[in-house]
Amino acid sequence: MCIRDRKLPPLNTAFKVQRKAKTLNLSYKNYDEALDDLISEINELKEATTLEDRKSELGDVYFSLINVSRYLEADPEIELKKSIQTFINRAKYVEKHINKETDINVLWQEAKKNQIDS
């Protein structure tokens, strides 16, 4: 499998490898199968017992997740940036409203409910 641009960030490289795998019929038939594979990889991560095994399984989870994004026709880089911004905005909301008596989890849920994500 030849991926020409070795300067791409790992997220983009993985996405490109997944697309190439599809052309070689080394891919799942549909989104549901790709999602099942992701869940399987998450379970393997959960069951791993050593740090090295956990790291290896985490890489597999990332790779499978990027494959799921391909089935959704979602650019993983863009979707990750959106999620990061959502987290930052919600964290700012929590930071702005926190006091000694306030439960952070309650504020977080409030931020989610009020769509504090853009």
Language model segments and positions:
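Short, small-residue-biased leader/transition segments that mark boundaries at the very start
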Residues: 1-3
